[in-house]
Curated annotation (Swiss-Prot):
Family: Belongs to the helicase family. AddA subfamily.
Cofactor field: Mg(2+)
Protein name as it appears in the record: ATP-dependent helicase/nuclease subunit A
Residues forming coiled coils: none
Name of the coding gene: addA
Amino acid sequence: MSSRNWTGPQEAAIGCREKNLLVAAGAGSGKTAVLVERVIRRISDPAAPVDVDRLLVVTFTNAAAAEMRKRVAEALERELEKHPGMPLLEHQLRLLPQADITTIHSFCAELLRRYHYLIDLDPEFRVADETEAAILRQETLEEFFEEQYRVITGDPDLEFLVEAYGGERDDLKLQNLVSGLHRFARSNPWPEAWLARAAAFGADPQGLDGDGPLAWGLRDLVGTGLEAAVFELRAALEAAKAPGGPAVYADALAAEVEGTARLAGLVAGDWEPLRAAFLAFGFTPRLPAARAGVDQELKDLCSRCRKKAKERIQNLKETFFARRPEELLSEMAALGPAMRRLAALAADFGEAYRTAKLARNLVDFADLEHYCLQILLAPGSTPEAPVPSPVAAGLREYYVEVLVDEYQDINAVQETILRLVSRQDAAAPNLFMVGDVKQSIYRFRLAEPALFLEKYRAFDTGEDAGGARRIDLSHNFRSRESIIHAVNAVFRRIMTPAVGELAYDTAAELVCGGTPAQLEGSGPPVEVHLLGAPTSVGRDTAGTADDEPDRSDEADLTAVQREARLVAGIIRRLAGLGGECTVPYRDIVVLMRATTGKAGTYLEEFRRQNIPAYAKVGTGYFEAVEVETVLSLLKVIDNPHQDIPLAGVLRSPLVGLGAAELAAVRLADKEGDFFRAVVAAAGQGGRLGAVLAGFLERLEKWRSQARCGSLADLIWDVYRTTGYYDYVGGLPGGAGRQANLRALYDRARQYEATAFRGLFRFLRFIELLQEGGQDLGPAPALAESENVVRIMSIHQAKGLEFPVVILADMGRRFYMPDLNGEVLLHKDLGLGPYFVDPGARVSHPTAAWHVVRERLRREQLAEEMRILYVAMTRARERLILTGSAGRLEQAVLRWSHAAAGDGETLPVPVLAEAESFLDWVMPVLMAHPDGEPLRRLAVRSRPAAGTPKDRSRWEVHLHRPEDLEEAAGADPDTAAVLESLRRLAPIPADGGLDEAVHRALSWHYPWSALASCGAKISATEVKRRFAAAAAGEEEVPAVFPYRAPPARPAFLETARGLSPQAFGRAMHVVLQHLDLAGDLSVDGIRAQVAGLEEREFLTATEARAIDAEKLAGLFAGGLGRRLAGALWVRREWPFCLVVPAHEIYPGLEGHPEERVMVQGIIDCLFAEPDGLVLVDYKTDRVGPGGEAALADRYRGQLDLYARAVEAVLRRRVKERYLFLVMTGSAQIIQ
């Protein structure tokens, strides 16, 4: 037994017997040590020892199981050293290798092999790895749908599903929906019953006045929205009453607060009175005019809060109360047959997939659990009354205790298995569960924290508890006191039952463990570094100033680079700037919510500042040139009649043809595919023919090898015979390139270790990885074990601890892809579908969809809150938080508003509408004494109140992007280098040396003009350049990228409520989707716009902004009539055009060989018998006589568009027009 000093709760958790025991262990509380000590004491108790093989210890991972077995063995060996020859200890050591210290899946697999005969399963089954399972699942899914389509005639529900949810061009959306529904159902112990119940969600016979899940969910959704509206209106009222505020608004706002609160009071009653009240409710049409001299910022704040409340209530009214409740319910009833058919498809696919696996003697991880349930459940068991089988009863008697680690991460199937093998419900309970629900972060793996929470709330905490007891381990032995106080300060205010699913009360908060290291000086304050954006970039990337939407993501990438630079500066400060290292790099970890797409940027910035760093980059492998080249060759070996892979191989170093030689190959056979042209060119002799003939000979050998031999051997033979492996080794980064090729070889070997064979299937598997966004990441240049800064995701850091944690990218928006499907899935509610009428081309969310979406959103928010908790509790010595906040002043105003409540926790609307970690943490700091730098930016700064319990200390730093750019402009070691140079003796004068130095310093790079010009340019940028040239403006070098002017502030918005950029985007949507064969009168266009709004192509605000009269005038004119009668029309037509670089970049006339690719989208192109007509939509405001100036401004752009059209379609563009939306006219470009 351990000699360490256990706390009282730890001792109770170790020694409590004959109860179901839930140990709620906070971060750093030593839960693993408690679990190991409990096992050791049970097996080494002299009075009542338990054989170690009669304990079932379930861990989350194989590594955790191995570590626990190792710890138990070491403890027994230590005891044996103290008591040599003690029979009990020797006996337990002999039993330990057979002990059930295992993962849940390993336990299930062992049970299946032992009792396979009960379910007619081959005991020699093999567990499929993820690669094998993914291929087989996809193949089975495709074959399953092919079989369904053979009998689709006479199955109207299946036809409806294909039409409504199948996608525009194929049925992949429906296939993925069925596959996802099957996988989701398998997380339930009774998947068939769950599918039947899920399909019936929304079909509540009590309607919206009952207490069914749909009615309850709608009331909760409406009530939450009204609560948020009341909060916004009260904030507006407070701003109106503030000194200098628009006091004249106060009476109207007070009445609106009261009226909204009355609406909220009706939510618990019947639906029809609530609906009537909603329809009758209205805001004051126009607030009184504010007196002169009123504080403009307070007035704007008041208007902004009131506007948000109005929009919120209007959205609720339009979504739920514009139609009668019978209409809402009738939509669900109409979808009932289709949802039941969808559930049946998922069940039938599951059976087809199970059959395919059994044919190969395979099982997946879900099979392990469900087959195990078949063995453990007696025949006749139901979800309401599960009965243990004789096998389960025997295991209950055999296991003296069942101990479960990381209990917060199990799912419902695993819970049922544990319930069946333990005596959880018996007279002598024996289930021990340990975990921390605040660290349950595996929802994406269908973990179910509600199972932990159910027991957390139900179990008693006293020593005299009956058969179930809860013990809280709150002492943290990991972090310094300053970090513990900071974690408590944040989560006391943000983790609530309404949003975080748990109250962060005295039972949940952390207590300093009191070790000397923790208490020494209590540690430095927690640092917070906030980074604002340049004025042209806001919280949402601003569009261009023009009427065309900006499709560039440059601003987002720049934000990542800026924050990476900020973090690099922090690391350099920690490590010591003068060469004396105060914190080793290996002690520093940078944590992010997700590293995909960002870790590479951080690595590059760290490398630039000479900071060694390591990250498992999950992207970039398949884009590596060497990997693309070999994969192209494998595609050609599989099927040489693929033009693009074949051309890529011929152009690559594997063959080495140039562009002119490829053109010559194409000319050898102009009619056939490219492979036929290669064969023809190979027979024409000459050097080119000889090269191609040699390639074809090798290709035929490889194709023969692919049919008969090993795939891995084929790949290595390609490396060896072509010398390509050695070739890439000689390129820059050669070691990494060779590592990438070895990884491809290893992947092929792993693939061949499965039940699959063949090159085609391997390539299909690679395609599945790429389509699913799964990448291997390039081979890293540094190892994780070296003295490097580690960059990892928060999930990768779970269970680990680090001396210094930098939690970066806290401004990242929460990513919630589960909320965007046409059919949403929820474990308790079931299916939430869109209502779709394919014939009428109508599609919109049902009430059930809204309810399911809101529940999923709340659960995902709770998950994000737990992820933040995990991140902040990884630090031992120092915790540093960084984030980009867009326009910092606006963000601080938002946080100031959020922090305005006086309660111990932040208001529920604030917590529920957070979009990032910053939206939770910063309002807490706004009310803290150390948050003064934030409050100075706010309109109204409340005194820092804090809370009586709050002993946290913070250090807040606000950074301007300009500071980072200036710091990045110089080498970090420049100052030291210059100082060293100053100390050197002067060099003796030498005329020849002077001349050489002069020549060297006077040299100019001959291609500097090219270096500042991009190889690809957007049509929007070309348009800007042409417009600048037309206006006689001086061109800005391309090295300084164009930045859009800042978005208009809210108080300058037009009456329509849209900025010019947003209006331009909305008009483009309308002109793209208008039915030109339909009614283009004023009423007809209004009807079509209403249809676009209903299908959610437009928001209500955008739809109201569309001027149907001007559009009708356009289409009634000559050009509009020609457009309606055209031979064909193409809208939003993308193009790429290669042009001489000097046509775009003045000053490059001396480089006629250089080319630039122009990429753009043509608004409209239509054909008439004698040629093509090109039309570009413009929403610019035009003054009297301004049409000609506008034509001059855009002439260069439309010339370029016309060249692109003529190059691609080989037809003449006879006319070019500007469609001037604001004047309702068309302007021809001469």
